[in-house]
Amino acid sequence: MAKELKFSEDARSAMLKGVDQLADTVKSTLGPKGRNVVLEQSYGSPTITNDGVTIAKAIELDDHFENMGAKLVSEVASKTNDIAGDGTTTATVLTQSIVNEGMKNVTAGANPVGIRRGIEEATKTAVDSLHAMAHEVKTQEDIAQIASVSSASEETGKLIAEAMEKVGHDGVITIEESRGVDTSLDVVEGMQFDRGYLSQYMVTDNDKMEADLDNPYILITDKKISNIQDILPLLQSIVEQGKPLLIIADDISGEALPTLVLNKMRGTFNVVAVKAPGFGDRRKEQLQDIAILTGGTVITDDLGLELKDTTIDQLGQANKVTVTKDNTTIVEGAGSKDAISERVEFIRNQIGETTSDFDKEKLQERLAKLAGGVAVVRVGAATETELKERKYRIEDALNATRAAVEEGFVAGGGTALINVIKDVAALKETGDVQTGINIVKRALEEPVRQIAENAGLEGSVIVEKMKEQKPGVGFNAATDEWVDMIKAGIVDPTKVTRSALQNAASVSALLLTTEAVVAEKPEENAPAAPAAPNPGMGGMM
């Protein structure tokens, strides 16, 4: 395939057109009075959204050079979304401003490498200032405010705050589609894993088809149980105690399973058997998690332990266990809080060290199960289009809230970015480096300017007036009032704001230092070949 090349000014201006087309589409959604964008789908109804990264990913331009510019901005939005989960529109607005101002200066003869140094220096100063002014998330009200601003819904804010309160900051909160029009919250207390009972004859509630065990002992092993004699001494001890038993094993087969079922049906003792969750090394780690949660010991060859020698002291315990055909839920395990805390910290360290996204996801699931359980937000809406839009908003709100828990929050509505301008302005360099600093100074005004313009006001007037206010006082575009943003509950997670700025500065600096662009040469449309006569149809009229 032949390639087409563009150099210097031609290359940069072509990419700039793509940057502007994507950014102009995305930035119309910024702020409380931002508009929606309708996205065509290959099938089904169109999607209506104001989610920056969703819009950015949907844009594909005909011109290869312009499309590369658009894709670089889309990359800024995606990376910000990956790191912080929100702030994608802000990142896009910042990128457009830095690129446009930078291009003007490079065209006028400035050295792009010097400009890049200035951009990097100013960005570092701005990020340090954001961290210095950040407030820690302390109350449920703080969480509700952050989620409300991100989703533009007080109801959603309260729902996410309630979910976080129930499962903890490290708990898993999943978002699913509801069959009704209402949005609700369900919480699975304790640890749940996706393994159900091995025989339906083990159920205790025939209506719900589930087995409930109150204050059970829990045998945890990575061995296969095929001979009932291996666990007979243990079963006799449990019968004497009069307590139910949950068996978590690699498998239960041979004579062991029917013997357990028969004794259960006779009323000798109450027992439920399930297979161990996970596979391979992950199975061993998950069994260890369950053991620590319940205060038991994993019966494994790795520790030199045999099933026939197992004692009641080596079993785990819990307040309640519920087993369905698909899942096992352990509520209020008897493990020590110190041991659980140590295990949580160990898994957190593993998350920080792993480079695999898949491993990280599995570790986070394990962390959540140990640290607080699982909350399910079931999103309801009247139509499929509204449902998609509401899901996007709730996902953004959830991500923003988690980001705020990590790094705190700052005044929202672009106010924090205006407040850090004075620290950036204090930087004194010379030549093109100073030009780069000035470009970032100008870009820091852009989110406020755009929020005001989307609200039908003159952006530059609002920006200048905000610079005269005390730090933290900003413009509430929803009510057209000047307020203390934090007291008014208009806040942004520090992680979201700083990620947007860092990613925008990084990609913009790369764009400005681009000297050549290589793209696929468009294929010329070949003339259509004349239709060949069909020999099998000769003579037919």
UniProtKB/Swiss-Prot annotation:
SUPFAM superfamilies: GroEL apical domain-like (SSF52029), GroEL equatorial domain-like (SSF48592)
UniProt catalytic activity: ATP + H2O + a folded polypeptide = ADP + phosphate + an unfolded polypeptide
Signal peptide (from-to): none
InterPro entries: Chaperonin_Cpn60_CS (IPR018370), Cpn60/GroEL (IPR001844), Cpn60/GroEL/TCP-1 (IPR002423), GroEL-like_apical_dom_sf (IPR027409), GROEL-like_equatorial_sf (IPR027413), TCP-1-like_intermed_sf (IPR027410)
Pfam families according to UniProt: Cpn60_TCP1
Positions that bind ATP: T29, L30, G31, P32, D86, G87, T88, T89, T90, G413, N476, A477, A478, D492
Top-level taxon in the UniProt lineage: Bacteria
EC number: 5.6.1.7
Similarity comment: family membership: Belongs to the chaperonin (HSP60) family.
Name used for this protein in its record: Chaperonin GroEL
Native species: Lactiplantibacillus plantarum (strain ATCC BAA-793 / NCIMB 8826 / WCFS1) (Lactobacillus plantarum)
Gene: groEL
